[in-house]
């Protein structure tokens, strides 16, 4: 078999790799005489105190480098393909609820890529369906003990799962869960709930089946399907209402009691949307079992509130004058307004009203901040008094780039609105500091291997923490 040679795209300053004389454009050929298929092999082979690298320079010269380091110390090398060291595996399903299928045409190409790659599950926390994982893939996960693996279950009824994923192998793919469970590989799960499809009795069946995998399967989130206005020709799905949400929460809470008695964990978690839709208070912090499902919007609002309060406890407050405005999605707006009032108790002259942005681009049913476009911000904020600064969450932007989903740049929006725009990171401290301090431009710090809005498996989506600001 021909050895794969992996192009080095970046060498970090003051790293071991820089000391060795490695440069962008060099190619890694092998580690300890072993070929490197992808990032899994690389990370596994690098977990040694003594490693021998075979590197090919651009002129074809080969260097053999012996490196002594700490066991898990990184060399400081970044590779092409965002560090995956291989092509991305696209999704082989056609899920009835896939968000990418609900997007308008003519957006940037990377937004239409659907992943279903177990390696991204390990590296980034993306959720995978297991339908395109081979036995070899499972064996590698077990051999390298790569965990946690995040799985999009949707339904434990094999026939229904095949229907929902539009993949005749989707039911049989659940057998791979048994292999991971028997090997002790930690897992997290997700169910995208579709009204009249996998809710009610089907959800009950799924929760019962999934509970048997606890505590190796350490958590399962239940999230409502996201529906845009671009669903022509797709499976007819309906949004959940208040009564539906109350039933879902009652069902989940009953299972939480069962799992607490048996394992001491809540195990099943409802995303924040369900509580808002049902007009119920969010659970207490200890009910989230350490916030294992933040990326699915489980507990993000509670955590943000906790962090805001903790940050304010360490501040004495003063009479500084600050003006501005916060723009956020419909889902988070009432909570952000509440947090601003807490800040004003210590900083009474801070005037930062919250503006709820309606998602006209994707449709009013989309209420999360991370799917708001620059055009919607421009249209709905023009003419308003924005004060010294406009605060927006990093979730609105593409990873570590200052560009919105509709390709409007942060600079273009700032010029159109004639104001400084401050990017707020996801933590409560970040929110407090952004509110009480003068405008200071700070680029978003989040990074990702590749761009994705939200595929059928609702993996990490750019910087799309859906409840941040």
Predicted features and spans:
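Terminal peptide-recognition signature
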Residues: 17, 25-28, 53, 98
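Radical SAM enzyme core and accessory elements
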Residues: 7, 279-447
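Structural preference for beta-strand elements that scaffold enzyme active sites
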Residues: 148-150, 186-188, 219-221, 267-269, ...
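Conserved PDZ fold ligand-binding element
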Residues: 19-37
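Flexible glycine/acidic-rich beta-alpha junction loops that bind and position SAM and/or redox cofactors
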Residues: 196-197, 217-243, 263-286, 359-364, ...
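PDZ/PDZ-like groove recognition
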Residues: 1-12
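Conserved G1/Walker A P-loop phosphate-binding module
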Residues: 449-469
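Conserved Radical SAM active-site core
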Residues: 60-62, 69-216, 226-255
């Amino acid at each position: 078999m021909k050895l794969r040679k992996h192009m080095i795209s970046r060498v970090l300053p003051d790293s071991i790799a820089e000391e060795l004389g490695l440069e962008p454009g060099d190619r890694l050929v092998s580690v300890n005489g072993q070929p490197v298929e992808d990032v899994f092999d690389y990370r596994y082979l690098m977990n040694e105190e003594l490693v021998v690298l075979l590197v090919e320079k651009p002129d074809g010269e080969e260097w053999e480098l012996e490196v002594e380091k700490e066991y898990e110390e990184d060399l400081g090398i970044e590779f092409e393909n965002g560090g995956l060291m291989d092509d991305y595996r696209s999704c082989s399903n056609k899920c009835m609820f896939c968000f990418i299928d609900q997007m308008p045409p003519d957006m940037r190409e990377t937004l239409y890529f659907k992943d279903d790659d177990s390696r991204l599950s390990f590296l980034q926390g993306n959720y995978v369906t297991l339908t395109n994982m081979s036995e070899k893939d499972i064996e590698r996960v077990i051999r390298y003990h790569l965990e946690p693996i995040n799985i999009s279950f949707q339904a434990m009824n094999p026939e229904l799962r095949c229907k929902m994923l539009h993949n005749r192998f989707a039911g049989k793919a659940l057998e791979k869960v048994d292999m991971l469970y028997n090997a002790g590989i930690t897992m997290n799960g997700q169910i995208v709930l579709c009204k009249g499809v996998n809710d009610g009795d089907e959800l009950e069946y799924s929760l019962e089946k999934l509970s048997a995998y606890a505590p190796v399967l350490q958590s399962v989130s239940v999230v409502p399907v996201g529906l845009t206005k671009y669903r022509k020709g797709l499976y007819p799905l309906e949004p959940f209402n208040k009564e539906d949400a109350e039933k879902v929460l009652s069902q989940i809470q009953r299972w939480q009691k069962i799992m607490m008695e048996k394992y001491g964990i809540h195990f099943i978690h409802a995303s924040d949307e369900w509580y808002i839709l049902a007009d119920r208070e969010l659970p207490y912090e200890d009910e989230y079992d350490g916030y294992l499902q933040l990326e699915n919007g489980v507990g993000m609002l509670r955590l943000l509130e906790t962090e805001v309060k903790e940050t304010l406890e360490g501040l004495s407050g003063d009479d500084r004058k600050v003006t501005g405005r916060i723009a956020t999605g419909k889902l988070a707006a009432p909570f952000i307004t509440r947090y601003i009032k807490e800040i004003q108790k210590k900083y009474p002259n801070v005037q930062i009203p919250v503006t709820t942005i309606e998602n006209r681009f994707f449709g009013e049913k989309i209420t999360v901040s991370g799917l708001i476009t620059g055009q919607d911000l421009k249209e709905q904020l023009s003419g308003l008094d924005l004060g010294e600064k406009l605060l927006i969450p990093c979730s609105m932007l593409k990873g570590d780039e200052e560009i919105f989903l509709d390709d409007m740049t942060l600079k273009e929006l700032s010029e159109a609105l004639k104001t400084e725009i401050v990017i707020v990171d996801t933590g409560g401290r970040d929110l407090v500091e952004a509110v009480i301090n003068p405008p200071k431009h700070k680029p978003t710090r989040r990074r990702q291997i590749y761009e994705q809005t939200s595929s059928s498996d609702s993996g990490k989506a750019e910087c799309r923490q859906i409840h941040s600001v």
